[in-house]
Amino acid sequence: MRVAVDGEAMQDAHGFMAKLRGSAPVCPVSEARQPAAALVTRYEDVRALLADGRVRHDVRSKAEREAAAERRELTPREELMYWALGGSMIYRDPPDHTRLRRLVNQAFTPRAVERLRPRLSAVADELVAAFAPGATVDLVGEFAVPLTTLAICELLGIPQDGRGAFWGWAQAINDAEAGDGYYEALAEAVEYLSALIERKRVNPGTDLLSELIAVSDEDGDRLSADELVATSLLLLIAGHDTSVHLIANAVLCLLTSPDQLAALRADPSLVDNVVEEVLRYESPVNILPTRFAGSSIELAGGTIPEGETVLLSVLSANRDESVFPDPDRFDITRSAAGHLAFGHGIHYCPGAPLARLEGRLAVAALITGSPHLRLAVAPDELR
């Protein structure tokens, strides 16, 4: 019998995952996009599988094999999805992943992220200064989205006239229930990025996308046009949405933990700790992108059969009481080192430095510029 991972279960995601950690750490489940999967919830198991070569990421090849077994071809929508997303390193296995990561890492460096600091810091302060005194503010719409949209667009070199659509695309592509909107957003994003890449080939700038176009290894290997689109989409989808959630979660955690907020105000140098504890305590991503078992895997007294989809819950792993003492307490003085919010192993999130920078600058700007910030509604009214 498979357990449904649906909206009802996710109403109390932490409670749901805690029960599974205790009773079924490797649980057969069904969810919106994966009718048959194994959900892994314990820290030790999640971390082990993140570094296990038997867990595969090439979902396009898996989909093609399944379609062939059903004596059919991939639908046009499936072709779009697997072409657009399957070309990024997150959905590739070695040696393809190794090659892509090596090329991307040449351009997407800590220095490239650090160059954004002055601009993002100034914009964060400007957004907070624009809050009307005593007014109710939509923190996501008026602060987190504009800040993170600016970050990813400045990083990639997206022109001003193309930035308005990015948040809508990211929302639709990340929404498991978007239906037609998912494919429409994906097609629009692919069309826009493909055209932009060709323009930057002719007129390169100092942005990441221009640098990704230019990078090559010692053998002259470069990213193909498809790989450039897929990598840009990865940054848009995974990076943008995750950073919005990180900022929103940070503010919610602080405002619902007055003692921790007071500690931060007393010692602003704790802002780095705040971001790491938020990443642990309220991970922006619950379940990491789809993987599958390349061969049968014995784990935690159970078996994940070959070909089964593997869902790794970092949200659950980061609340595992065997690793983090008193895990359901938000504590900005604890060492949250070792959390899995950005993954682990060769697929560790390349955008982690950017997300951390955005989170730190956002929290610092809000604490400094809005000393009387408080929730406008009860926490249980938020969604």
How should these model regions be labeled?
Residues 1-383:
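Cytochrome P450
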